[in-house]
Design a protein with these regions (language model features):
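Short, ordered coil/turn segments that flank beta-strands lining enzyme active or ligand-binding pockets
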Residues: 69-70, 165
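Nucleotide phosphate-binding site architecture
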Residues: 94, 104, 170
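Short active-site neighborhood of thiol/selenol oxidoreductases, capturing the structured segment around
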Residues: 75-97
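N-terminal targeting signals for export/organelle localization
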Residues: 1-63, 182-189
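Structural microenvironment flanking redox-active thiols in thiol-disulfide oxidoreductases
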Residues: 97-133, 144-146
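Thiol/disulfide oxidoreductase modules built on the thioredoxin-like
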Residues: 131-137, 143-189
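Hydrophobic beta-strand anchors of alpha/beta hydrolase catalytic cores
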Residues: 85-86, 114, 160
Length: 189
């Protein structure tokens, strides 16, 4: 029992350190654009279950439910059969703050579904970020325990999950410029 409790605390502390250092910057370079290098992983979400002929099969990666900022419920299955972008962010992340206007513009110009997945802060701070950064044009999840992040293998922000209409998922853990984001989005349609 003590060992299990110690392991949970150690893993929790390691996760906090990882997330904190992944988005931190010194004040000297906080206003400069960050590098766009990062990690990309691709997975094909294997369909499971049966559906009616007119309903798309829900890939495993889209089998999740989460609370939205504002208190509603979002079902990942609602994205089945259509291209989508999940944007993983945190309210205090300077890279997320810088890329927010580009995300909003890409979501507005695209037919692809966008969903923000906020973690590592309170719902109140998430709401403030959405309002101040102008990214309220698409749903945002209040993933306070980072469960959706873990479901997609995301450990740091900013990150993206690009989901094809066939359910293939490409996770990119890097800050993207608006042009890089639009190129990725164009590849989904």
């Amino acid at each position: 029992m003590i060992v299990r409790m110690w392991m949970k605390r150690a893993l929790g502390a390691a996760a906090i350190v990882l997330v904190t250092t992944a988005c931190g910057q010194s004040p000297d370079n906080a206003a400069q654009p960050g590098p766009t290098t990062g990690t990309t992983t691709t997975a094909t979400a294997a369909p499971s279950g049966t559906t009616a002929a007119s309903d798309p099969v829900v890939p495993e990666k889209l089998r999740f439910s989460a609370k939205t900022v504002g208190g509603g419920t979002f079902e990942g299955a609602s994205l089945a059969g259509k291209p989508a972008v999940l944007w993983f962010w945190a309210p205090w992340c300077p890279k997320c703050q810088r890329e927010a206007s580009g995300i909003a513009a890409a979501a507005e110009r695209s037919e692809v579904a966008f969903v923000g997945v906020a973690a590592n802060d309170t719902e109140g701070e998430m709401r403030r970020f959405i309002d101040e950064r102008g990214v309220g044009g698409f749903p945002h999840l209040a993933d306070e325990q980072a469960e959706v992040w873990a479901h997609f293998g995301v450990a740091a922000q900013p990150a993206y999950a690009f989901i094809s209409s066939a359910g293939e998922v490409e996770v990119v853990t890097a800050q993207l410029t608006e042009q890089e984001l639009m190129a990725k989005v164009a590849g989904l349609t």
